[in-house]
């Protein structure tokens, strides 16, 4: 009887250790994300290209690294910005600026698009404000790595499968 109690306590300790390991992995990933956010001064320091509007410069699925510590916006710079009232960030190139108004950039355009983005802006919005609308400037990229996120968005059941596999791996792992 004493040996079965000892075995139960050992199993409970192992289970708790596995759950804590899984929590450690998740919290480490979260801390790394927040650390990148602080260093880059961007709410989203890494984004995935979701459309072909920036081809041939960036393809759908490319992973972009952003930096948002610049105060000026230059023509030709590739920016990621949010349109007020919409939740998906847009990756486009600056084709015109307002030098007379500090911090304001206007007329982004996808390299593969015929027209600029002014039709995408919120009603009565003629420009993008650097402080409010810009998520960051593209400083680097890794081709096709972000395609995993696109697949997870397009096929929600894959998220469940991946989380289940990650949880299973943590639970199976013995130290």
UniProtKB/Swiss-Prot annotation:
Q: What is its EC number?
A: 3.4.21.89
Example GO BP: signal peptide processing
Molecular function via GO: serine-type endopeptidase activity
Query: Which reaction equation describes what this protein catalyses?
Result: Cleavage of hydrophobic, N-terminal signal or leader sequences from secreted and periplasmic proteins
Indicate yes or no for the key word Transmembrane. Answer: yes
What positions constitute the catalytic site? 53 (charge relay system), 92 (charge relay system), 117 (charge relay system)
**What's the chief localization of this chain?**
endoplasmic reticulum
Transmembrane regions: 15-31
Region of interest called C-terminal short (CTS) helix, as start-end residue ranges on this chain: 161-172
Q: Which InterPro entries match?
A: LexA/Signal_pep-like_sf, Pept_S26A_signal_pept_1_Ser-AS, Peptidase_S26, Peptidase_S26B
Per the UniProt topology annotation, the Lumenal ranges are 32-175
**What compartments host this protein?**
Endoplasmic reticulum membrane
Give residue spans on the Cytoplasmic membrane side.
Answer: 1-14
Q: How does it sit in the membrane?
A: Single-pass type II membrane protein
Keywords (alphabetical) are: Endoplasmic reticulum, Hydrolase, Membrane, Protease, Signal-anchor, Transmembrane, Transmembrane helix
Q: What role does this protein play?
A: Catalytic component of the signal peptidase complex (SPC) which catalyzes the cleavage of N-terminal signal sequences from nascent proteins as they are translocated into the lumen of the endoplasmic reticulum. Specifically cleaves N-terminal signal peptides that contain a hydrophobic alpha-helix (h-region) shorter than 18-20 amino acids.
Q: Domain description from the entry?
A: The C-terminal short (CTS) helix is essential for catalytic activity. It may be accommodated as a transmembrane helix in the thinned membrane environment of the complex, similarly to the signal peptide in the complex substrates.
Similarity annotation: Belongs to the peptidase S26B family.
Q: What is this protein called?
A: Signal peptidase complex catalytic subunit sec11
